[in-house]
A protein has these predicted regions:
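Conserved catalytic-core motifs of GNAT/GCN5-like acyltransferases
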Residues: 64-67, 125-127, 137, 142-158
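Conserved G/P- and acidic residue-centered "switch" motifs that form tight phosphate/ATP-binding loops
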Residues: 103
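Conserved acyl-donor/pantetheine-binding loop and adjacent beta-alpha core of acyl/acetyltransferases
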Residues: 56, 60-100, 110, 149-156
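A short beta-loop-alpha structural element at the N-terminal edge
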Residues: 4-17
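Acidic/histidine-enriched, beta-strand-rich ligand/metal-binding domains
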Residues: 91, 98-100, 119-125, 134, ...
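Conserved GNAT acetyl-CoA-binding A-motif
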Residues: 109, 114-129
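Active-site rim helix/loop that mediates acceptor-substrate recognition in acyltransferases
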Residues: 26-80
Length: 166
C-alpha cells in the first residue's frame, strides 16, 4: 500500500518538479526550471506537492490575482501575483507519466481546493486542453470560454470554480 503525503514545495523540490513537468507536458508548454523556482519562492502556499512513499509524483502550482486574465503570459512568472488576492490561477496540474492512472490528479485537486478554501480564496481558475474539460467539470469547475492564449502553440479552454463562502 502506498503512503501519500501532501505538502507545500520547498526550493529543493524545483529540479524534480521540472523533470515531471518536462516529461508530462508537450512541446513548449512546460514551465522552465527558472519559472518553477520563481513559483516556489514567491508563493509556496500555492505550490502543492504530492509524494508517494517519499517520492514526488505530482504537483499543482498557482498564483493569485485581483483581476484574472487567463491569457496573460507574464503572470506565469508571477508578474502581478498578490498572495492576498482572492482569485487563484492554476498554472500546472501535473503527475509524473510513470504514476498516472492512479487518481493522483484528482487527489491533488481535492487537497488543493481544501487548502485554497481554508485560505479564504473566492475562485480557482485554470486553462486546460479540450480533452480535459469534462474531467475538470466532474471536479466542480465550470466551463468559461475558449482561451485567447496559444501557450505552447496549443488551444486552451478556461475553467473556473467558485469556492464555498465566496
Amino acid at each position: 500500500m502506498s503512503t501519500l503525503r501532501f505538502r507545500n514545495a520547498l526550493p529543493s523540490d524545483a529540479v524534480r518538479c521540472h523533470e515531471i513537468e518536462s516529461t508530462a507536458y508537450e512541446g513548449d508548454e512546460a514551465a522552465t526550471l527558472a519559472k518553477i523556482e520563481t513559483r516556489i519562492g514567491q508563493y509556496p502556499q500555492g505550490f502543492l506537492i504530492l509524494e508517494d512513499a517519499g517520492h514526488i509524483v505530482g504537483f499543482i502550482n498557482s498564483g493569485c490575482a485581483h483581476d484574472v486574465v487567463m491569457s496573460d503570459e507574464a503572470f506565469k512568472e508571477l508578474v502581478g501575483h498578490s498572495a492576498d488576492a482572492p482569485n487563484v490561477v492554476i498554472m500546472s496540474v501535473v503527475v509524473d507519466p510513470a504514476s498516472q492512472g492512479k487518481g493522483y490528479s484528482t487527489a491533488l485537486m481535492r487537497e488543493f481546493v481544501q487548502r485554497m478554501t481554508a485560505l479564504h480564496k473566492a475562485t480557482i481558475h485554470l486553462m486546460c486542453k479540450e480533452r480535459h474539460v469534462s474531467l475538470y467539470e466532474r471536479m466542480g469547475y465550470r466551463y468559461v470560454q475558449p482561451s485567447p492564449s496559444d501557450h505552447g502553440g496549443m488551444a486552451w479552454h478556461e475553467m473556473v470554480m467558485e469556492l464555498p463562502g465566496a
